[in-house]
UniProtKB/Swiss-Prot annotation:
Highest classification ranks of the organism: Bacteria, Pseudomonadati, Pseudomonadota, Betaproteobacteria, Burkholderiales
Organism: Acidovorax ebreus (strain TPSY)
PROSITE patterns in UniProt: RIBOSOMAL_S21 (PS01181)
UniProt keyword annotations, A-Z: Ribonucleoprotein, Ribosomal protein
GO terms, biological process: translation
Record's protein name: Small ribosomal subunit protein bS21
GO MF, one annotated term: structural constituent of ribosome
Family of this protein: Belongs to the bacterial ribosomal protein bS21 family.
Disulphide-bridged cysteine pairs: none
GO cellular component, as recorded: ribonucleoprotein complex; ribosome
Keyword NAD: no
Amino acid sequence: MTTIRVKENEPFDVALRRFKRTIEKLGLLTDLRAREFYEKPTAERKRKKAAAVKRHYKRVRSMQLPKKLY
């Protein structure tokens, strides 16, 4: 469980913002959303493979020389 210590005379909004930031850095919300519903192992492999292919094409496209602009 993530905890933060509220400093003396610290507004609630600031403490809440700090809490949200720590949760975001730890990646708890993304993990929680991913585990919200059961995903079959084949569907998980398929999703990860598609993401890897997309990353690969993006990396290849960024390494290519730009087309001539004339």
